[in-house]
Amino acid sequence: MPKMKTNRGAAKRFKKTGSGRIKRGKAFTSHILTKKSTKRKRSLRQADLVSSADVKNIKKILPYM
C-alpha cells in the first residue's frame, strides 16, 4: 500500500491541538480592512476550532495529522 498524500494547502491552514481537536485561522483578514471595525478585526485574530461537521473531511485530506 503506497503512502497517502497530504494536501499541502490544507497542511498550512490547520494545526492539531494538544487535545486532538483541529485549529484554524479566521477568514476576512487579508485586505479591505478599513471598513471593518477595530473590535471585529481584533476578534478575527483569534484562532478558532474547526466545526464538527467538517472534521471528517479535514482528517481525510490530512492523513498524518
Curated annotation (Swiss-Prot):
Q: NCBIfam families given for it?
A: rpmI_bact
As one GO molecular function, the record gives: structural constituent of ribosome
Q: Superkingdom of this entry's organism? A: Bacteria
Q: Does the keyword section mention Methyltransferase? A: no
Q: Where is this region: Disordered?
A: 1-29
Q: Which HAMAP family match?
A: Ribosomal_bL35
Name a GO CC annotation attached to this entry: cytosolic large ribosomal subunit
Q: Does the keyword Ribosomal protein apply?
A: yes
Q: Which UniProt keywords apply?
A: Ribonucleoprotein, Ribosomal protein
This protein's encoding gene: rpmI
Cite the record's Basic residues compositional bias ranges.
Answer: 10-26
Q: How is this protein named in the record?
A: Large ribosomal subunit protein bL35
What Pfam families does the record tag this protein with?
Answer: Ribosomal_L35p
The entry assigns this protein to a family as follows: Belongs to the bacterial ribosomal protein bL35 family.
GO biological process entries: translation
